[in-house]
UniProtKB/Swiss-Prot annotation:
Organism for this UniProt entry: Neisseria meningitidis serogroup A / serotype 4A (strain DSM 15465 / Z2491)
PROSITE patterns given in the database record: PROA
Phylogenetic lineage: Bacteria, Pseudomonadati, Pseudomonadota, Betaproteobacteria, Neisseriales
Keyword vocabulary terms for this entry: Amino-acid biosynthesis, Cytoplasm, NADP, Oxidoreductase, Proline biosynthesis
Designated name of the protein: Gamma-glutamyl phosphate reductase
Signal sequence, renumbered to the chain: none
PANTHER family listed in its UniProt record: DELTA-1-PYRROLINE-5-CARBOXYLATE SYNTHASE, GLUTAMATE SEMIALDEHYDE DEHYDROGENASE
Length: 420
């Protein structure tokens, strides 16, 4: 048995301590985990410095921001755990009841998933978010961090397990796979005897590898090739504010806009205003400017590089924006359906017909009208922190909170009935 299999077995053996814990016990564990995380801040920051030093020069500046921890972010992680404790416990919820003509009483009841595996990349906060959500939803959790964030993840998990040790929940219900080699990921993908669910969080390569190779049930958290379409009937003040926020507030996250579509009737006047906002104003403020990848029509109005063959199919996760002009809302929808990832897409318009057409025909997990796509987030949706953004349709779609991490079973109460 490999070390990874041993850790999977430990999580499976410990799952009953979580599956059977009542709400009070789980919340007590979460508060202890949050307190322990804050108490270990110095150790976590020291570990994070190791990760940052190892990554220096090897990852883009925008990705460094995802990896970076500071005292404020650690406090936010701890507060995120406490916020999960404050959420209603979904386990045990009665979803449906019915009584059959033969007198059988059937109850559909929400139950814990069992053991959840998470494979993720360079975001240390995923470690605490995933642990909190899994444990509150009644499941043990096995985490597999990417190499970039491994030292940070190890220090965070050590702190969380210290908190768990003060409660009735077995600390072995939280595992961080120690082997950061590729084989450990494939072992998790094949671990159907240990894992009830596997969730990948990261770039397109990781997600594709898990979806194509896993024999464990998977929820796909797709990449975010996020579009915003500026209609000819858009309010320009709204449009500029929304585009600025969607692209620059945190470009390294999956709900950040990657592609801007602009109606050709307004492109000549709108795009220069956008260029001023995203490029010149940011340079004057000492901020990184947005770099444009332009189709031929957009290039007539603003400066930037010519869009390459793959630029409208790329999740840049950087201060890069692909820009294309379109002749209609129908063309915008066609482009999004051809190039999007069904994550989050939006329209800016004052035309109700255009908005209705867009929301009806765009088949994404979150579809926006006159708002930034950066709101696709469990916390912003009132779900607490999230396990990821599901872009598939089965079981879960959009931000995955506590309910999306549970299953259900039927409890059938009889008085001696037999089937004829």
């Amino acid at each position: 048995m490999s070390n990874t299999q041993k850790q999977l077995a430990l999580a499976k053996a410990a799952k009953k301590s979580v599956n059977t814990a009542d709400t009070e016990e789980k919340n007590r564990a979460l508060f202890a985990m949050a307190d322990s995380l804050e108490a270990a801040a110095a150790d976590i920051l020291a570990a994070n410095r190791q990760d940052l030093e190892a990554a220096a020069g090897n990852i883009p500046e925008s990705m460094t921001d995802r990896l970076l921890l500071d005292g404020k972010r650690i406090c936010a992680m701890a507060d995120g755990i406490r916020a999960v404790a404050a959420l209603p416990d979904p386990v045990g919820e009665i979803l449906e009841t019915s009584t059959l003509p033969n007198g059988l009483e059937i109850v559909k009841k929400r139950v814990a998933m069992g053991v959840i595996g998470i494979i993720y990349e360079s975001r240390p906060n995923v470690t605490s978010d995933a642990a909190a959500l899994a444990l509150k939803s009644g499941s043990a959790v096995v985490l597999r961090s990417g190499k970039d964030a491994f030292q940070s993840a190890r220090a965070i998990v050590a702190a969380l397990k210290t908190g768990l040790a003060q409660t009735r929940i077995d600390p072995d219900a939280l595992q961080l796979i120690e082997d950061t080699g590729r084989e450990s990921s494939y072992e998790m993908m094949r671990a159907k005897d240990y894992l009830d669910l596997l969730i990948p969080r990261g770039g397109a390569g990781l997600i594709r590898a898990v979806v194509e190779n896993a024999v464990v049930p998977v929820i796909e958290t797709g990449t975010g090739i996020v579009h915003i379409y500026i209609d000819k009937d858009a309010d320009w003040d709204k449009a500029l504010r929304i585009v600025y926020n969607a692209k620059t507030s945190r470009p390294s996250v999956c709900n950040s806009m990657e592609v801007l579509l602009v109606h050709e009737d307004i492109a000549a006047d709108f795009l220069p205003k956008l260029e001023r906002l995203l490029v010149r104003n940011r340079i004057e403020a000492g901020l990184p400017p947005v770099r444009f990848r332009l189709d031929p029509q957009a290039a007539r109005h603003i400066g930037g590089e010519a869009a390459g063959a793959d630029d409208f199919d790329t999740e840049f996760l950087d201060y890069i924006l692909a820009v294309k002009t379109v002749a209609s809302v129908e063309e915008a929808v066609g482009h999004i359906e051809a190039h999007g990832t069904h994550h989050s897409d939006g329209i800016v318009t004052e035309n109700r017909h255009a908005a209705d057409y867009f929301t009806t025909h765009i088949d994404s997990a979150a579809v926006y009208v006159n708002a930034s796509t950066r709101f696709t987030d469990g916390g912003e949706f009132g779900l607490g922190c999230e396990m990821g953004i599901s872009t598939q349709k089965l079981h879960a779609r959009g931000p995955m909170g506590l309910k999306e991490l549970t299953s259900y079973k039927y409890i059938v109460q009889g008085t001696g009935q037999v089937r004829e």
